[in-house]
Amino acid sequence: MLITINIMRIRNLLLAVAVTTCGSISAQQWPYQNTNLSAHERAVDLTSRLTLKEKADLMWDESAAMPRLGIKPFSWWSEALHGLANQGNVTVFPEPIGMAASFNVPMVERVFTVASDETRAKWNEQYQNGIPTTRFHCLSVWTPNVNIFRDPRWGRGQETYGEDPYLTSLMGQAVVRGLQGPETAKHRKLLACAKHYAIHSGPEWSRHVANINDVSPRDLWETYMPAFKDLVQKAKVREVMCAYQRWDDEPCCGSPK
């Protein structure tokens, strides 16, 4: 499990290095620096060169620099649920639950294209001014939230696209396309993140202690999973955040299921 998680994280780190440095390494020394290789090949090579401590460091939302490997620091945590968060003068759009009520998928994609443009502009400004990448000042956004809003006690329900799996999937895909840019592009504009995988629907106060063990296989696959499947397979989302609670007695972040 650790190897799998690290390889997935390394793939995104390689992409992050590409979108932030774009040729800053003057000479290729190792296979992971060879952009002609597949992401998987590069990730496997880089993982093999990391120490245990370096692998552990990559599991945080703030990845430390690794000068010996030519890797700069990278922050994974920013938010753009309805526009870039915590960044001053940016456009604030309606909450996702409101956008979902429009049933207008192309509009949602345009909204998040604007959000990604503004995120890029903010990041370019800080980069040009020598401001290091930090939390909320980065190119990785933990958006969209494609959980199913079933419990009115959940104080984050407004982050979702409602209780319909099909609509949630369509809206989520539009968000990812708007944030990441065209799949045919050489590099992504941002790294989008599908969250929270899976069966995460509140209430918020019990998210770290809840053990969900009453979900039928049919409900799992017809209600909770479709949006995540579509975001990964169709929209090519670059990140997936696991849920906080347990499912069938196993923490979602460590479940073999």
Regions found by a protein language model. Give the residues of each.
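N-terminal compositionally biased, intrinsically disordered segments and leader/signal-like regions
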Residues: I5, T21-C22, N36
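Extreme N-terminus of proteins, especially the signal/transit-peptide cleavage junction
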Residues: M8, S24-Q28
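Bacterial N-terminal signal peptides that target proteins for export
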Residues: I3-L14
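Glycoside hydrolase catalytic-domain context in secreted enzymes
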Residues: A27-K257
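Bacterial N-terminal signal peptides
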Residues: L14-C22
